[in-house]
Amino acid sequence: MPPPPHIKPENVLKRAQELIAVGQAPAALNVLHEHVTSKRTRSSPISSLEPVMLQIVELCVDMRKGKAAKDGLYQYKNIAQNTNVGTIEVVLKKFIELAEKKVTEAQTKADEIQSSLESAAPSANVEDLEAIETPETILLATVSGEQSRDRTDRAVVTPWLKFLWETYRTVLEILKNNARLEVMYQTTALQAFQFCLKYTRKTEFRRLCELLRNHVQNAAKYSAQMHAINLSDPDTLQRHLDTRFQQLNVAVELELWQEAFRSIEDIHTLLSLSKRPAKNVMMANYYEKLARIFLVSENYLFHAAAWSRYYNLLRQSAATLAAGQGTKKENPSVTEADMTKAASFVLLSALAIPVISTSRSRGALVDVDEVRKNKNTRLTNLLGMAQPPTRAVLFKDAMNKGLLKRARPEIRELYNILEVDFHPLSICKKITPILKQIGSDPEMEKYVVPLQQVILTRLFQQLSQVYESVELKFVYELAQFPDPFQITPAMIEKFIMNGCKKGDLAIRVDHISGVLTFDSDVFSSAKALHPGSAAGSAESEVGSVQRLQNTPAEIARLQLTRLAKTLHVSCMYVDPSYNESRIQAKQTAQARALAGAAKEHEETLARRVIIEKKKEAATDALQRKQREEETRKRIRTQQLQEAEKQRLLDEQREREKKRIKDEQDRIRQQELKKQLEELKSGVKGIDINEIDLQDLDANRLRAMKLAQLEKEKNELNDRIRTTGKRIDHLERAFRREELKHIPEDYEAQKKRDMEIYEATKAETLKEAELKHKEAVALKHRLSRLVPHFNSFRKEVSEKRHEEFEKRRKAAERDFEAKKKQRVKEVQERRRREKMEREMAERQRKEEEERAQREEEEKRARDEERRRVLAEEKAKREEERKRLDEIAAKQKQREEEAEARRAARKAGLEPAAPAARPEPTERTAPRLNIAPRTGGPSWRERQAAKEAAGGAAPEAAPKEEAPQPARRPGGYVPPHLRSGSSAAPAAPPSNGAPERYVPRHARESSSSQPPSRTQTPGSDKPSEGGSAGKWVPRWKQQQNQ
């Protein structure tokens, strides 16, 4: 069976309205729901689908069908989000508006039902809308028959409250993580917060917060989707921040402190992601709510730190507004009263920080625990502080900012009593009026109990410094507070036991004798509170308590310290050299530090430059990577969009083809049925029952119909012709009878017409005569007024002419004045333009002269630089030539030494030395410090040479080996300066002592390896016949 043809949305809506009109709302909803969830609906235009969705929403709200509404809205969002986002917002707003309207109507109905009850009766307070009926309520409804307010609200209002809550949740699920529907998502979240606040829905508020938190966490997971939100976008992040701040405000109003703290963490996470700084008004709200949360959790240290941050923000906002650098919309409005109130709370909250730990376990052990450290680190990060706050640091910060002058007088006096001039014997008397003033203020009343704990701690700490034991009665008398805040002896003993349990106090209570004994173990170590402890005091006992005198334990513990200090002072007086050496060492260290400071500073600057360059490179790489990622993502998104668009176009094209084909088939079938019905009812003479309808088509039916119509037409023409003949005979008879009575009728008609004419003529003449008489009378009456009218008109004309002349002259005067003014302005403008042109010309000339002067200076600098470079180049050439001469001399000396060694080895006298040029530079003479070995000295040999007349046996002539190529201007090693078969050079002629050569060098001088620029077989063959082939050094030694 083929699928049913697609029905247009207009027809579906019309059918649903018809069903609603006859009371079939569920059937209408079913029809609309099936149409919207059908795949064929995707090709329908959005403008025709929107009324269908609005009707579905109305029916779902009326029947409380949240599941059907959710399915339809999801399908509609998938259809419309790529083309028209506004229609989705319209439908969802309508959905929420109808649900809220139903809740209001339900409340009105419940009020009408309970109009006979007392107006002050408690309202319904169902803890969980998803668990309305509990076993207890069912049993109570069964046993009790009375209709109470709670039962009425539970039966009438609560179901609609549950439906409204499901509506908000459904809308948020539909709009989540969609950048196009982001504004609507934030608006719906704010409406849901207001719903929870208005109806005090604490359970639903927790679920709502968890739902929004999951949406943000899943945003990164689904970031690759087509319309996913981007938390890196400042506007998106700002909207989420606004939502979280509203969530924080509602949580504080509902007193859900855990949810408020989690909202604070969400805000801190979003602020860490934000690239733009948060507004001061938002941060002020942030710190204010955070202070309230810490106060409820009795974390007085971080409560005071939050107040301190809030006060700093108010000061910054006031300074910004005073300097005119910010707007009132972004900065909280601050007055002097607000600053005084904030300063008072900062100081009071700091005073309320416990000096010792207030937790039930041992403070020292808990503070070391890793969980406690992590918690304190988290709280410190939430406050935006670099390190955990302490009581001493908060007081120091408050004093530096002058909070003591801004605070209220009683708070200032309380600070002086507790921190500056604490006296245990009179503390309660001094503080009683102050506590009464603080207790009278509802906002400050919460600090009375922690202040009592601080006072008791100070009291016992200072009593332990003075007394070893005191009576309980005496302690009870000292700890007397005003009446509303009176402390009983049991509370004091509980405080003592708690302090002893944690190790903060060392007190024993003897109830028999009624005495308090302070522990005075001289070998006990004083406990130092751990930084960041739960109590909040990170200061040592010495810094937090006014020292009256040292305890025996401190005296025993500090004995070695005092002894060392005394010995140090004695050594300084007894041995002056000790002090001098200490001062000298200090001065040496200072000099060394000063000497290395400049270098260290330069290294630090260099490291800073390197770090900045690395940071810039990392930032550039990160930005480049982000740009590439964004480009890839944008290209991928465009490709996906194009592919999706092409797919939708293909599907729409296929659906259109199929729809046209189905429509053609349907029209063909309907036409066939219609023709059959016409043949059956309209055309006579054809028996349809005898026709085979299976083989019948439109052409055959049309031919049958035309044949039958032609037959009927012929029959009709025959009947008309017969009837016409009959009518012609009757008409001819009627006219023959009328001819007899026509003359009589003509005479009667003529007489009636003459009578009517005479009557009309007489009446017309009478009316004309009457009108003439009336016109003549009117002329006589008006003729008397003509002179007066003419004089009046002349008068008015003269006045108007005079007025016109006055106005014309005034206009001419104004024209002349404005003309003169215009001429003056034009002259002034031309003069000003001329001056500007002259000034511009002068500036241009000055600029050209300056440019010419700079060009000449630049040319002179270039000439000077070229001259300097030429001089430096000449100096380098001279230096290179000098080095070449030195290298040549060195080479010559080495060749002479090698020649002497070769001659000495051969047992021959050295040949006459070649003439050697005198050195151009003076060098120190070489000294032969080696001892004589029995041979003649060089002087003896020189004398023998002179006696022989300078003649010497010539060495056998040998072919001179080709000199190796030498690199210009560089050092040439000895083995590259001469070939292995070269003859030894003659010794120098000036008689300079030869250079010492090691034995292994002398032995291997005759078998020098080939130079690096020669091949092993490049040398000419020597006399020994061994120069044609390269032989390793070790093999040459073996051959020798």
Curated annotation (Swiss-Prot):
It is found in: Cytoplasm. It comes from the Eukaryota. The keyword Glycoprotein does not apply. PROSITE patterns: PCI. GO terms for cellular component: cytoplasmic stress granule; eukaryotic 43S preinitiation complex; eukaryotic 48S preinitiation complex; eukaryotic translation initiation factor 3 complex, eIF3e; eukaryotic translation initiation factor 3 complex, eIF3m; multi-eIF complex. SMART domains: PINT. Residues 339-523 form the PCI domain. Keywords: Coiled coil, Cytoplasm, Initiation factor, Protein biosynthesis, RNA-binding. Residues 617-641, 795-1040 are annotated as: Disordered. One of its GO terms (molecular function) is mRNA binding. Pfam families: eIF3a_PCI_TPR-like (PF22591), PCI (PF01399). Its main location: cytoplasm. Residues 908-917, 945-955, 978-993, 1004-1018 have a biased composition (Low complexity). PANTHER family: EUKARYOTIC TRANSLATION INITIATION FACTOR 3 SUBUNIT A, EUKARYOTIC TRANSLATION INITIATION FACTOR 3, THETA SUBUNIT. Belongs to the eIF-3 subunit A family. RNA-binding component of the eukaryotic translation initiation factor 3 (eIF-3) complex, which is involved in protein synthesis of a specialized repertoire of mRNAs and, together with other initiation factors, stimulates binding of mRNA and methionyl-tRNAi to the 40S ribosome. The eIF-3 complex specifically targets and initiates translation of a subset of mRNAs involved in cell proliferation. HAMAP family: eIF3a. Component of the eukaryotic translation initiation factor 3 (eIF-3) complex. This is Eukaryotic translation initiation factor 3 subunit A. It comes from Aspergillus terreus (strain NIH 2624 / FGSC A1156). The lineage of its organism: Eukaryota, Fungi, Dikarya, Ascomycota, Pezizomycotina.
